[in-house]
Amino acid sequence: MNDEQMAEIMPLIMYGGEAKSSAIEAIQAAKLGDFEKADERLDAANQAIISAHHGQTNLLTQAASGEAVSVSIYMVHAQDHLMTGIAFVDLAREIIDLYKVIKKY
């Protein structure tokens, strides 16, 4: 793995973790009835996912063009962070919707 690939992998880890943290903050805000903050944190989580996807797309493009992209524990870890972040954002949306329904009653 070269330095350029490592520089592309690290943001996946960072943005994936940021998405997960923001999604948890969104759930916590909704639990307290602060749906404006919940939406704000979900937006931040979505932006982190988008940023991570840009890095992932670059790596996929390199591989698709025939460039050697070595799979390392860092790359596996990065993909894990990204997928976990995506899962948390998806679940956060559903949980926030449930809190909104509960708050009505």
Model-derived regions, located:
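Terminal alpha-helical segments
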Residues: M1-Y105
